Amino acid sequence: MAKRTKKVGVVGKYGTRYGASLRKQVKKMEITQHGTYTCSFCGKDAVRRSSVGIWKCNGCRKVLAGGAWTMSTAAGATVRSTIRRLRELNN
């Protein structure tokens, strides 16, 4: 096989199209999108994206809702902390 690309990585499929800065943004997004994440239920590094905003753990078969390109978003973290604070106030 021929030697693969070193600099551009996953966005080599776009060639010289769309401009360098847009390809850098897409590269960052696609790396986080196609990576694996740690499951908060079983602890395995087996969570993969199955579709937009839906993440599935291949270890314990749990299905999680998350962001479109990353498993957790800043808005989701804010909501979780607010829920935790409200639960502490009720108890």
Swiss-Prot record:
One of its GO terms (molecular function) is structural constituent of ribosome. InterPro entries: Ribosomal_eL37/eL43, Ribosomal_eL43, Ribosomal_protein_eL43, Ribosomal_zn-bd. It comes from the Eukaryota. GO terms for biological process: translation. SUPFAM superfamilies: Zn-binding ribosomal proteins. GO terms for cellular component: cytosolic ribosome; ribonucleoprotein complex. A zinc finger (C4-type) spans 39-60. Keywords: Metal-binding, Ribonucleoprotein, Ribosomal protein, Zinc, Zinc-finger. The keyword Cytoplasm does not apply. Pfam families: Ribosomal_L37ae (PF01780). The keyword S-adenosyl-L-methionine does not apply. Belongs to the eukaryotic ribosomal protein eL43 family. This is Large ribosomal subunit protein eL43. It comes from Dictyostelium discoideum (Social amoeba). The lineage of its organism: Eukaryota, Amoebozoa, Evosea, Eumycetozoa, Dictyostelia. The gene is rpl37A.
